[in-house]
Amino acid sequence: MRCVCASIRRTRIIEFLMFFALSSSTASCAPFSVSNVTHASPRPRWLRWHEKTSMAGNPVSLSIATPNGAKSSSICSANTVGFTPDTYTCPDIRDSSTDTLSRSKRISSLSLTKPISSSSESETKVLSAS
């Protein structure tokens, strides 16, 4: 009985280590990955993700698309800098067709553009949200 329990325990530890190795190697491929999107009320709109580059604290551009096709964008600035997940705030995201705050709309997608280096290159991450 003791032998069977030790074997099961060893198998689970190996599975956990393999899962951890795969998940950490996958996460390091992207320059950034969105971990959580929340809508603060009434303003601003918060976008949080884990930093994968040394560009922590730099402004990013956030574009919002609503189901009716309206789009808007805003420059977001960092609230925190460091190796913890940075929180960016986008205070004036507006629906360009009606000039109303997008928080009253159902958001179909967010497109996040973040500088890769000091050059004009950028990396875009598109995610779904509702």
Swiss-Prot record:
Signal peptide: 1-29
Sorted UniProt keywords: Glycoprotein, Host cytoplasm, Host nucleus, Secreted, Signal, Virulence
Gene Ontology terms: cellular component: extracellular region; host cell cytoplasm; host cell nucleus
Short sequence motif named RxLR, residue ranges: 45-48
TM ranges: none
Glycosylation sites: 36
Compartments in which it is found: Secreted; Host cytoplasm; Host nucleus
Signals that turn on the gene: Expression is up-regulated at later stages of infection.
Keyword Signal recorded: yes
Family to which this protein belongs: Belongs to the RxLR effector family.
Function: Effector that acts as a broad suppressor of cell death to interrupt plant immunity. Inhibits cell death induced by cell death-inducing proteins, including the PAMP elicitor INF1 from P.infestans.
Domain remarks: Has a conserved RxLR motif that acts to carry the protein into the host cell cytoplasm. Lacks the 'so-called' EER motif, which is found closely behind the RxLR motif in most of RxLR effector family members, but the presence of an EER motif is not always essential for the translocation of every RxLR effector into host cells, or for inducing a hypersensitive response.
Name of the featured protein: Secreted RxLR effector protein 68
